[in-house]
C-alpha cells in the first residue's frame, strides 16, 4: 500500500457507494408509496443517505482520491423491490426487516487509529444518523406489522419463550457446575 494512502479509503469508498445506492432505491420507494407516514420516513432516510454519499465522496476528494465504482449485486434486487407493486410491509420484509437483528455494524469503525480528525467527525455523524435511520425504519415496519395484525405481541411471545428456554439452560448448567464443585469439596 502507498505510504501516503490512508488505510481507511476502502471504508470511505464503500460508504459513498452504498449510501448513494440506498438513496436511489429509498427515493424510488418513497415516490411509489401511498402511505403518507411511510413516505415521510422513507424521504427522511433517503435524504440522509444521499447526503452521506455526497459527504464521503467529498471527503475522498479532499484526501486526493475519488470514488471507485464497485458492483453491488443487491442493488438491482433492491430497486426492483422498491418499484414493485406490493405493500410497504412486503417491501420491508423483502429487504430483510423482521429477520433477527445482527450486532451493530459500526462498533469496529474506530478501531483504525490512523483516522484523521475531519474523517472521524464525519464518521461519527454518519454512524449516529445511520443508527437513527435504522430506528425510524424499524419503527415504521412495526407500525405496518401492527396494522396488518402481525404486531409485537406474537413476536414478543415467541422471543420471550426462546429467552426463557435459554435462561433455563444457563441455570441448569450453573446448577450442574455447582453440584460438581460441592462434590469436589466433600472429597
Task: Label each region the model flagged.
Residues 1-187:
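Non-heme di-metal
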Amino acid at each position: 500500500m502507498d505510504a501516503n494512502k490512508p488505510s481507511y479509503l476502502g471504508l470511505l469508498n464503500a460508504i459513498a457507494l452504498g449510501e448513494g445506492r440506498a438513496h436511489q432505491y429509498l427515493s424510488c420507494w418513497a415516490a411509489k408509496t401511498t402511505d403518507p407516514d411511510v413516505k415521510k420516513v422513507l424521504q427522511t432516510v433517503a435524504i440522509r443517505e444521499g447526503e452521506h454519499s455526497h459527504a464521503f465522496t467529498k471527503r475522498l476528494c479532499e484526501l486526493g482520491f475519488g470514488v471507485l465504482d464497485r458492483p453491488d449485486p443487491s442493488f438491482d434486487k433492491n430497486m426492483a423491490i422498491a418499484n414493485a407493486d406490493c405493500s410497504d410491509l412486503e417491501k420491508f420484509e423483502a429487504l430483510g426487516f423482521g429477520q433477527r437483528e445482527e450486532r451493530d455494524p459500526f462498533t469496529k469503525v474506530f478501531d483504525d487509529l490512523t483516522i484523521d480528525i475531519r474523517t472521524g467527525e464525519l464518521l461519527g455523524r454518519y454512524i449516529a444518523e445511520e443508527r437513527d435511520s435504522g430506528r425510524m425504519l424499524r419503527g415504521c415496519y412495526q407500525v405496518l406489522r401492527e396494522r396488518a395484525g402481525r404486531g409485537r405481541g406474537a413476536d414478543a411471545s415467541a422471543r420471550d419463550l426462546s429467552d426463557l428456554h435459554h435462561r433455563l439452560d444457563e441455570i441448569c448448567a450453573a446448577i450442574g457446575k455447582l453440584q460438581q464443585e460441592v462434590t469436589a469439596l466433600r472429597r
